[in-house]
């Protein structure tokens, strides 16, 4: 595909993210489409570690946070319904991912990239590397508050980044 499109420096890897994550060092662009559950976190971690100037991820499956989600009292009546708890876990997971990207020097945004009539998994996390330094301390405090609010003990990307 790279040859056919004239992008001779474009390289595709097939396999587990961890198996190819250290091969080339730096990366200009990281794209992860529908990497299941914590595979999205592995991909984001690789992009951050490689210093990618642009990271695009379309997450899929959010079991890690769903299993831990402990609704705060104010949300218990709403999140006692399985489908609502599942959707909340998806939003919280992707919100944490965007926040972690911001903590680690990226400007992140989350948006719908394809109509929900085609797929329910239609969120895109986009992040570009900041050119100016920033103070991550206030963002780290927000992360701690968010994790505590939902009773979350761990999140894969946070662990990989040492947060």
What kind of region is each of these model predictions?
Residues 1-163:
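Class I S-adenosyl-L-methionine
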